[in-house]
């Protein structure tokens, strides 16, 4: 009896387009749908009411799911647009000479170059005074543990060498930069020259990492060596730039020797002459079919240039002058 009375009340409310508060609902177009809904409820009895309750509880949530997803995607799209355009910073499309897209973010096409492989590799600065001898003996002493640890694993040796070789240019460039700011003086281009050297050595390392996958203990060794060498060279450069540059010059001479031995093993077949990494081909403008031997050849030439620059810088200091008084070899990789 009560169910019949309730059905009649609901039917009249739906047909008249009113809600539970007595307010009239939106449109009369809903009335046929409401009438059909009411007939189903009455015909189904208790089951009909359960079906109606379940539908009202489930349908709105299901309808909201795609809307939430759309709102989320829209917010994400708006956020990405804001992040890339709000500050007005956007990278222009960079292409190679053949029109293909440039794949690297770490350097641009105008920073690539062809290394001068005809440079004299046999040059050696003969120690002339006590400080020169100290620098020379220090480098020879540092070579002993390197030979014992790496032996003829020249790929791993080169990786370790480049983590050290990239430090002096950064330290020297940084200290000259601070000196220029402190004394209101030009650097003579030496800040740029030394930072270019550091960047060039870093690219050597990025290339070697593509060829040699360092083990966990080698990574740990790199961490320790870099921490010790950076701080030691920082203090040395403050105390005596002439000795610091002379040590780097002798380090580069050792690097030339190591890469020469590397090439001997490549030529003898002891080390496989694998294809050159893509980053090396683009950085040194090598042929597309370049091999590892070509990469080691250009890296060795770079080390010879760094040898000349640092011995030259040390000679300037030994003559009692400052670096800014002599023209810096900018772009001299």
Swiss-Prot record:
One BP annotation, GO: alternative respiration
Cofactor: binding comment:
Binds 2 iron ions per subunit.
Q: Does the keyword Iron apply?
A: yes
Q: State the EC number(s).
A: 1.10.3.11
Alphabetically, the GO molecular function entries are:
alternative oxidase activity; metal ion binding; superoxide-generating NADPH oxidase activity; ubiquinol:oxygen oxidoreductase activity
Identify the Pfam families for this entry: AOX
Chief localization: mitochondrion
Keywords recorded for this protein, A-Z: Disulfide bond, Electron transport, Iron, Membrane, Metal-binding, Mitochondrion, Mitochondrion inner membrane, Oxidoreductase, Respiratory chain, Transit peptide, Transmembrane, Transmembrane helix, Transport
Oligomer status and interactors: Homodimer; disulfide-linked.
Query: What does this gene product do?
Result: Catalyzes the cyanide-resistant oxidation of ubiquinol and the reduction of molecular oxygen to water, but does not translocate protons and consequently is not linked to oxidative phosphorylation. May increase respiration when the cytochrome respiratory pathway is restricted, or in response to low temperatures.
Q: What is this protein called?
A: Ubiquinol oxidase 2, mitochondrial
Q: Which gene encodes it?
A: AOX2
